[in-house]
Amino acid sequence: MKKIITTLAFTIISTVALANSGKFNASGMGSWEMNIMNAGNGNMAITYDGNAGLADKDPNSIFDKSTMNCVGGLTLVGGKFEDETGMCTFYLADGEKVFINYKGKGTGGQGGSGTFVKS
């Protein structure tokens, strides 16, 4: 089993499915543990479990000064994936928790697109 700990700087621009729909624009730093099976020719399976601290560009956002834990995975075939799924728990500054399910698709080594879904 191959384990990789990665420090990741990222920006999240997403639609959040809460009681009401909305968007947030957060950035942060995190650490991710990944399991990767590389079969070559752009074919691989990836699972990940990571934590990050976030700051939102809108200081009134519930996601400002929050942390998150996400667990998910995807399978690349020919360098492309259509099946990324996962779930994140956001720990908000006021002590509350928000759960978000997500789905994504894209091309390995590049940005992708994703949508959040209600659970």
Locate the predicted segments by residue.
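Beta-strand-enriched cores of mature, soluble protein domains
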Residues: 19-119
